[in-house]
Amino acid sequence: MVASTKYEVAAQNEADEADGSAQGDGAGPAAEQVKLKKEISLLNGVCLIVGNMIGSGIFVSPKGVLMYSASFGLSLVIWAVGGIFSVFGALCYAELGTTIKKSGASYAYILEAFGGFLAFIRLWTSLLIIEPTSQAVIAITFANYMVQPLFPSCGAPYAAGRLLAAACICLLTFINCAYVKWGTLVQDIFTYAKVLALIAVIIAGIVRLGQGATTNFEDSFEGSSFAMGDIALALYSALFSYSGWDTLNYVTEEIRNPERNLPLSIGISMPIVTIIYLLTNVAYYSVLDIKDILASDAVAVTFADQIFGIFNWTIPLAVALSCFGGLNASIVAASRLLFVGSREGHLPDAICMIHVERFTPVPSLLFNGILALVYLCVEDIFQLINYYSFSYWFFVGLSIVGQLYLRWKEPDRPRPLKLSLFFPIVFCLCTIFLVAVPLYSDTINSLIGIGIALSGLPFYFLIIRVPEHKRPLCLRRIVASTTRYLQIICMSVAAEMDLEDGELPKQGPKSK
C-alpha cells in the first residue's frame, strides 16, 4: 500500500535539494524535510511516561489489590512486585528502543523480529479494542469526576458525561494536531499537577503517622491470602496502575538523542512512580482500615473526606486532571502507532501523512480521535476492557521474545544499551504467567479477545498481502480519492523517513 518511492534516504534528498538550489537563483536554503521532528526532550519524555502511568489507577486500584491480598502488608508487597516487574519490562523496552529506532513500540519490535503477519495482528488488536477502548474509558472517568460534584444527591446524567468526554477527546486531538510542543506542554503541566496531588496525600499520611496512627500496620500480614489465584488477581490490579511504562517507545523517532534520553527517561520515571505508589498506599493505610477501603469506589476520595475537610473537593479534581493528562499521553502514543502501521503498509497510506507546516501527523490523530468517539457510543464500554488483557500481555511478551531472538539472530547488531539476558528472560517467564491466568480465571473474555485478534486474518490475507495492482479497481479508486481529498483537507503529504543507521526500510512481503 505504500510505494517504496515514498521513503528516500535523507542524504539523497538533501543532495537533490542542494543540486536544485545550485541551479536556481540561490534565494534560500533547501526546503525542509516533511517528517516528524525531534521535539521531545528528556523532561518531556519523563512527563510522558509518568503522566501516562499515573492515571486514575492509583486513586482507585488500591481497593482491588487489597481485596485479593486481604492484608495491608501483603498488598504493599504486591505493589512493590508490580513496580519491579514494570521496571524489568521498561528496561527491556529501553534496549529495544535504542536498537530499533522506530516509533510504534511493540508493533515495531514484533515487525522487526517476526515479520508483518504477527505485527499486523498486534496492530489490528490495538485498532479494534486496546487504544480506542482505553481512551474512551479514561475520557468517561474524567467526565464523571468533573460532572458528579454538580449532582451531589443523585447520579450525573448519562448524556452530560458522554458529551464532556467527547469534548475532552476533541480538545486534546486538536491540541496535538496544532503543534507537538502544545501536546508536550499539556503533558508536562498535568503531570506536575497529579504528582503534586499525590505528594499532598503522602504528606497528610506522614503527618498522621507522626501523630501515632500506626494501628493498621500492627500485624500487617494477618489474614493474608497466599492462594496463587488471589495473588495473580491482586498483581493484575497493581499492574493496571503501572501500565504506560512503554509510552515513550511509541514516539522514539521524535526523541532528541534517543540513545541517551530514552533509557534515561525510563530510568528516572520508573523509580519515581514506584516510590510514589508505595508511599501513597502507606498514606491511605494510615487513615483508612480494610473495611473502609473495600467499601470505597474511589479510595483517594474517601481518604480526602476524612483528612482534607472542606478541601476534600481537591482530590476528585486531581483525579479528573490525572485522567486528562493520561488521555493526552494515550492519544500521542496511539496516533504514532497508527502512523507507523500505515507507513509499513498495514493501514491506508493517508494515515501516515504529515502536515506540511506544523509537522504533526494530523490524519492519524483524527483517525484515532474518531475511533475513540465511536467507542463512547458503547454504553457498557467498561466491559470491553475485559477482552484485551490476554492480548495486551501476549504481545508485550512477544516483543521481549523478539528481543531474545534478535540477540541470537543478530549478535553483532549495534546496541547502545545491552542488558543482561536475566532481565528479558525473567520478564518473559512472568508474562507467561500473566497470559495464562486470565485464560484460566476469565476464560470467556480471554477467548473473545483472541477472537477479536484473529478477526484480522481475512483482512490481512485478502487485502494486505494482495499486490496493489491485483486489488479491485473500485477499491483502488476509492482509496486514491480518499487519500487525495484527505491530503487537501489536512494539508498533509507523505512523510519522509530519516533513517539514522543508513538502512533502507524493509519492503515487500515481510513488511506486508
UniProtKB/Swiss-Prot annotation:
Glycosylation sites noted in the Swiss-Prot or TrEMBL record: N328
One GO CC annotation: basolateral plasma membrane
Oligomer and partners: Disulfide-linked heterodimer with the amino acid transport protein SLC3A2/4F2hc.
GO biological process: amino acid transmembrane transport; L-arginine transmembrane transport; L-leucine transport; regulation of arginine metabolic process
Topology in the lipid bilayer: Multi-pass membrane protein
Protein family: Belongs to the amino acid-polyamine-organocation (APC) superfamily. L-type amino acid transporter (LAT) (TC 2.A.3.8) family.
Organism annotation: Rattus norvegicus
Alphabetically ordered keywords of this record: Amino-acid transport, Cell membrane, Disulfide bond, Glycoprotein, Membrane, Phosphoprotein, Transmembrane, Transmembrane helix, Transport
Protein name from the UniProt record: Y+L amino acid transporter 1
Protein purpose: Heterodimer with SLC3A2, that functions as an antiporter which operates as an efflux route by exporting cationic amino acids from inside the cells in exchange with neutral amino acids plus sodium ions and may participate in nitric oxide synthesis via the transport of L-arginine. Also mediates L-arginine transport in non-polarized cells, such as monocytes, and is essential for the correct function of these cells. The transport mechanism is electroneutral and operates with a stoichiometry of 1:1. In vitro, Na(+) and Li(+), but also H(+), are cotransported with the neutral amino acids.
Primary residence: membrane
Keyword 4Fe-4S: no
Tissue: Expressed in kidney cortex and intestine.
Keyword Ligase: no
GO MF annotation list: basic amino acid transmembrane transporter activity; L-amino acid transmembrane transporter activity; L-arginine transmembrane transporter activity
Localization (cell): Basolateral cell membrane
Modified residue annotations for Phosphoserine: S21
Encoding gene (name): Slc7a7
